[in-house]
Curated annotation (Swiss-Prot), chain A:
Region of interest: Core promoter DNA-binding: 189-193, 249-252, 283-286
PROSITE patterns, A to Z: TFIIB (PS00782), ZF_TFIIB (PS51134)
Full protein name: Transcription initiation factor IIB
Record keyword Manganese present: no
Family: Belongs to the TFIIB family.
Residues found modified as Phosphoserine: 70, 76, 92
Name of the gene: GTF2B
Keywords: Acetylation, Acyltransferase, Chromosome, DNA-binding, Metal-binding, Nucleus, Phosphoprotein, Repeat, Transcription, Transcription regulation, Transferase, Zinc, Zinc-finger
Record's catalysed reaction(s): L-lysyl-[protein] + acetyl-CoA = N(6)-acetyl-L-lysyl-[protein] + CoA + H(+)
UniProt keyword Transmembrane helix, yes or no: no
Primary localization: nucleus
Disulfide cysteine pairs (residue numbers): none
UniProt binding sites for Zn(2+): 15, 18, 34, 37
Amino acid sequence: MASTSRLDALPRVTCPNHPDAILVEDYRAGDMICPECGLVVGDRVIDVGSEWRTFSNDKATKDPSRVGDSQNPLLSDGDLSTMIGKGTGAASFDEFGNSKYQNRRTMSSSDRAMMNAFKEITTMADRINLPRNIVDRTNNLFKQVYEQKSLKGRANDAIASACLYIACRQEGVPRTFKEICAVSRISKKEIGRCFKLILKALETSVDLITTGDFMSRFCSNLCLPKQVQMAATHIARKAVELDLVPGRSPISVAEAAIYMASQASAEKRTQKEIGDIAGVADVTIRQSYRLIYPRAPDLFPTDFKFDTPVDKLPQL
Amino acid sequence: MVPVFAHLTCSSTSQVLQTLDTSQSNRLFSNCPQGAMTPGIPIFSPMMPYGTGLTPQPIQNTNSLSILEEQQRQQQQQQQQQQQQQQQQQQQAAVAAVQQSTSQQATQGPSGQTPQLFHSQTLTTAPLPGTTPLYPSPMTPMTPITPATPASESSGIVPQLQNIVSTVNLGCKLDLKTIALRARNAEYNPKRFAAVIMRIREPRTTALIFSSGKMVCTGAKSEEQSRLAARKYARVVQKLGFPAKFLDFKIQNMVGSCDVKFPIRLEGLVLTHQQFSSYEPELFPGLIYRMIKPRIVLLIFVSGKVVLTGAKVRAEIYEAFENIYPILKGFRKTT
């Protein structure tokens, strides 16, 4: 099975008849084949696949792989060190059953804190089901901040949480501070402070949050159908365009829009439910709702099917 | 309508201010009376327009800095009056034969014969009064001296100072316990904070007095009041028996606030001034603008209110506001 063709920067081997042809690698047979004429140009190419296949139900102590874990070259400083493994025979244990050679520590003392932080980041991201690309971006950000040492006095967990927040923002799927707070032990205030410090230290900036960024997540957490979600998105966008809610946080406006859309549809949600999902107080939702309520007929999309007509919407 | 005046923004150099200073003080006392005496020639507004009941104000403050501010503010007020006057007078312009000079100084005695168009901010060397053009129209543009950003008038809004924080060294070690026990309006809780918190009613301020003899005075609304309050606290400490002195009084921070009277589009502002602004509606509803020169932090809100802080002198607050005002005007909400 031909693998993806490699574009050689320094073509060491080329087909003698077709010097411009890009050779195709057949790793199973260890060949490099010219696609034009089929000539096998390089053979006995070393197979870079794994030596053994290991399964989780095999006896775990007898892992025959001799290469160890995959490297993390971008992050840790190159993990090319080796460790002395645990002893297997009887000679490696002394009379009490403790292993005689116990040095498995200080493998990467300079990166210990960093590896701890990566572990923490992975744990946090796992709690809110963030994809691998966000975790990688967070790790990169953390490494940059850590190497700069300008935020050295701050708790690593706080910096990790703030990096996670920035990574979500940069990937275009922002999470609210409260959502990051929920999976971290750091307070919102501290995460906010670290966030501003990191932006200054890395000299980057992030886009402003909009109401539409959160709609799909909040609506699916509330199990609202797609029409309600689209209506809520439309309402929130229109409310901001018409400047009905000056100075309000986009989260609060989104919440009020979801409330209005859900109340107009068959799937009604209370303010308390919406507030629990979004981390917004229900008085805040009430305040924003009061601001958009007067223009309710203008805010709904034109093709919306009202279960409760506009004039019967609850007025708080 | 061509704005005839070249307007001085507060970011001008201090030299400009000083030359203004001297020329203005000359004008204050020489232009007014003589211009009025000249019969038959309608007079364009001198420094003090007649009939407004204004008299040239004597300089009251002891602070040399505030002299400059006073004059700046006077200029701004006068400019506004100027513009009103100018509009009235342009209607009469066809009738009037006006001799117009390109600058108004030549403020010496004989200047009263040629009524001069008051031009508040030109600083060119004044041509002799006799060489003024004979047929100027009021619309002749003056040569702007200070480079003016187009359509930038000084805003006419003056930030009000809300809080001044100052420190002073009383120069001797203090026993906080005796101070707390004997002084009125003093609280001392060493487990919570290692200083005596003392308050006086006039000027309404609070002071933190430390055992090393250093003191922080907060809450005053002007530099003079802060100094006066600090002196009062020092006197209280002195009366309690400590050899208090008044060394190194320094104002550490000044906070001012004002209202631009129109709503502002913060999202637009953060997009264009990204390297200075920080706007996180989740964290704080206002935009935090860190101006580099002068080094002032401004909190800008959607309603149009602006808070300026981080200044060591009053002029920095005014300068910062004059710098931000045209920017804010550009982001005015149109609905």
